[in-house]
């Protein structure tokens, strides 16, 4: 097949971690915001701000909530949080919270606010902030699904049933999505809050449960898929890398390797979180690690692994590509299966399942198990940052 001429591997792709390239994570280049509460802040101000999230004053409302959860009136606690962020290496800017966060009659989280009690307000606001932070990574459509299908169960399990009332209306979610974007002050303040939360053992479990750690856009999912595919094919990882990496994917793969090496070399758990979150905290980092090319690698791996387990596609709902590339991915998968089947001469590493699938395919990938869906959606869930249509057309010419 013509597209096989475009395959080449990573053995000649040098990942020189000392070379710079502007891709290394440097926390000092990211300014995190920490909001302070005002001297006259009372419970009514907090509740009004909570109700206003998702409305026209979302930025102001979130600044009030973030100031509240950072305990800005407790000077010792406040200074401890600042110290944690600075020790990781971030630049920190202290900013007063907004004076007026009430959005009048437009209060998207009014139902949540109405259920809050004095003894639950802190946990409810933490849960709201964890949920809002996901808008950096997921688009509105995916957040609607998350809020409808997953948030209620998590909220109940962790004792904050008030979050079951989190709105799913597109207008409120679109407003949140427009405010919580890479490089925005409120976004950096959200992740400053999350980093401190995760640095504390007593809060780590709850933070993860409420999805603060859903950052698998860093490529960790692809690594798991790759390992599974190598095992299924009976291929050595180095050989599979050579077959899998098309010319236009190499830069993206290099970024993944660089990022994972930085994660593995981090000396503390806080620093590891900081590295993984780097693409959330700075617009330039976010675009540099926009791993849309890796969604295509993952689509190929899903096509291979789909021969073995129906769970492959169910566990990877976010990995979806254009119809053109989905077709190409299936043909690449067949080429890989045929190569390793023939190379083993029916011996070790040649699964009978693969043999049967290839014999019955007559050159086409048949069966729906593991088949990537045709509609396009980025692997990491970011909404419409960059169009990928041109890239897909470039790939399809190799079919």
UniProtKB/Swiss-Prot annotation:
Main localization of the protein described in the UniProt heading: virion
InterPro entries on file: Rhabdo_ncap_2 (IPR004902)
This protein's record includes keyword Phosphoprotein: yes
Write out the ranges of the annotated region (Disordered).
361-399
The protein's location, in the record's own words, is: Virion; Host cytoplasm
- Name the family the entry cites: Belongs to the novirhabdovirus nucleocapsid protein family.
State whether it acts alone or in a complex, and with which partners, per the record.
Homomultimerizes to form the nucleocapsid. Binds to viral genomic RNA.
Name of the protein described by the UniProt record: Nucleoprotein
**Upper lineage ranks?**
Viruses, Riboviria, Orthornavirae, Negarnaviricota, Haploviricotina
Q: Which gene is this protein's source?
A: N
């Amino acid at each position: 097949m013509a597209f096989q001429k475009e395959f080449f591997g990573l053995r000649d792709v040098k990942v020189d971690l000392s070379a710079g390239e502007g891709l290394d994570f440097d926390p000092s280049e990211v300014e995190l915001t920490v909001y302070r509460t005002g001297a006259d802040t009372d419970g009514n101000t907090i509740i009004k701000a909570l109700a206003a999230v998702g409305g026209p004053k979302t930025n102001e409302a979130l600044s009030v909530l973030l100031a509240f959860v950072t305990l800005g009136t407790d000077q010792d606690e406040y200074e401890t949080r600042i110290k944690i962020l600075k020790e990781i290496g971030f630049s920190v800017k202290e900013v007063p919270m907004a004076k007026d966060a009430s959005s009048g009659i437009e209060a998207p989280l009014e139902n949540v606010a109405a259920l809050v009690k004095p003894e639950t307000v802190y946990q409810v606001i933490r849960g709201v902030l964890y949920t809002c932070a996901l808008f950096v990574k997921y688009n509105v459509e995916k957040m609607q699904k998350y809020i409808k299908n997953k948030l209620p169960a998590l909220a109940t399990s962790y004792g904050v049933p008030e979050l079951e009332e989190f709105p799913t209306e597109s207008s409120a979610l679109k407003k949140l999505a427009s405010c919580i974007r890479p490089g925005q002050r409120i976004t950096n303040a959200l992740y400053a809050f999350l980093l401190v939360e995760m640095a504390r053992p007593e809060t780590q479990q709850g933070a993860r449960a409420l999805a603060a750690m859903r950052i698998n856009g860093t490529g960790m999912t692809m690594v798991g898929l790759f390992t599974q595919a190598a095992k299924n094919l009976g291929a050595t990882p180095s050989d599979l890398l050579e077959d899998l990496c098309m010319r236009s994917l190499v830069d993206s793969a290099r970024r993944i390797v660089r990022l994972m090496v930085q994660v593995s070399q981090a000396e503390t758990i806080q620093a590891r979180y900081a590295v993984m979150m780097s693409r959330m905290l700075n617009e330039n980092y976010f675009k540099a690690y926009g791993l849309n090319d890796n969604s295509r690698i993952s689509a190929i791996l899903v096509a291979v692994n789909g021969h073995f387990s129906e769970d492959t596609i169910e566990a990877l709902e976010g990995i979806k590509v254009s119809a053109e590339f989905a077709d190409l991915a299936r043909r690449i998968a067949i080429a890989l299966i045929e190569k390793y089947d023939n190379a083993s001469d029916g011996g070790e590493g040649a699964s009978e399942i693969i043999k049967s699938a290839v014999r019955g395919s007559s050159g086409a990938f048949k069966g729906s198990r593991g088949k990537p869906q045709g509609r396009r959606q980025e692997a990491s869930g970011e909404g419409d940052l960059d169009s990928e249509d041109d890239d897909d057309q470039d790939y399809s010419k190799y079919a």
